[in-house]
Amino acid sequence: MREYNTIFNHALAPITPGPSSSNTCGPVRIGLICQQLLGEIPAKAVVEYYSKGAFTTTLYGMKSDVAFINGLLGKEQNNPEFNAAYTIAKEVGMDVSFAEVDDLTVGGMETVRIRMTDQSGFEMVVIGESIGGGAFKIHYIDDC
């Protein structure tokens, strides 16, 4: 399918399944960069969010959980199967969970630490932050 640059996608905001670009596009993109850094769909992923951060109240209601899973599956935010992320993760054998933690104080209110394990047992940790408008920052990649 051919993609066209449009003012709506590239100047105003990314195409997002909603309800909020910082709660869906940012998390999808964080998950996607994590999957790309790992080099494959993780066998296991734990998405940790700060107990005093924004995801404590928005993770499930704003579909951020679904967005992180889509990214970890290597899918973009405009993927037509966006809402089926949990089912697809199960089908491909990805064990994913979410955990509230007290020790994640780097970054802003929408920061997560994603702990991933690949099929061979290799582990990687990435800390990323959704900063609005579908943009994100990576604060940490395995001691880098």
Regions found by a protein language model. Name each.
Residues 1-8, 39-44:
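Acidic-glycine-rich active-site phosphate/pyrophosphate-binding loop
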Residues 12-33:
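Conserved phosphate/anionic-ligand binding catalytic regions in large, soluble enzymes, centered on
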Residues 18, 29, 36, 67-68, ...:
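N-terminal loops that bind phosphate or other acidic moieties
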Residues 26, 30, 34-39, 46-50, ...:
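Accessory carbohydrate-recognition regions in carbohydrate-active enzymes
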Residues 46-95:
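A structural-propensity feature for long, helix-poor, extended segments
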Residues 50-54, 118, 132-134:
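Glycine-rich beta-alpha junction loops
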Residues 67, 129-144:
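A conserved regulatory-domain signal marking ACT and ACT-like small-molecule sensing domains
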Residues 90-129:
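C-terminal edge-of-domain segments
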